[in-house]
Amino acid sequence: MSASTQVTERIPHRPPFLFIDEIVSETPDGLVARRTWRAEESFYQGHYPGAPITPGVLLCEAVFQAGALYLARAAADAPGGRGVPLLVKIGDARFRSPVYPGDTVTIEVKKRDLTAGFFAMSGTMKRGDTRILSVEFSVAWKAPEASP
């Protein structure tokens, strides 16, 4: 499964560094997305040969991209909504279970607070009922700079 147009129209990420396949649902305060980790992805060749596990940093990135999708919707409704998401803070990341090639995960992000243009968010990743990851993070939305 490749990323839906719904995803690629909102955020600038593209394969091979796009880790959201589809948006499942949205609310005013959050978003739920889905991702299937495909065995043919090149990072599995080195992490780890013969015993592939999805790198934790990529699991976090998938959560951050879900946060970017949420913010892109909010920015689209604001004046001058074009821009890119910038991750500004990561805190309290906890990994509880590994993710293997072929696993499909659900990612949920929720807005916790908005202060001075920074969105504080929480994110979780699950495989079925098994919690894989929880992380707190903050994102800013950067408008494009004028060209000289």
Language-model segments: what does each one mean?
Residues 58-66:
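Short amphipathic alpha-helical face segments that pack within enzyme cores
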Residues 15-54, 59:
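Catalytic strand-loop segment that frames the active site of acyl-thioester-processing enzymes
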Residues 8, 50, 95-97:
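Beta-strand-rich interaction surfaces with strong enrichment in secreted/lumenal proteins
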Residues 1-3, 8, 52, 147-148:
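RNA-interacting cores
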Residues 2-14, 80-82:
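Short aromatic-glycine motifs in intrinsically disordered, low-complexity regions
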Residues 1, 66-106, 132-134, 139:
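Hydrophobic beta-strand-centered segment that forms part of the acyl-chain substrate-binding groove
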Residues 22-25, 92, 97, 111-113:
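A residue-level detector for short acidic-glycine micro-motifs
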Residues 28-32, 99-103, 108-148:
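HotDog/MaoC-like acyl-thioester-processing domains
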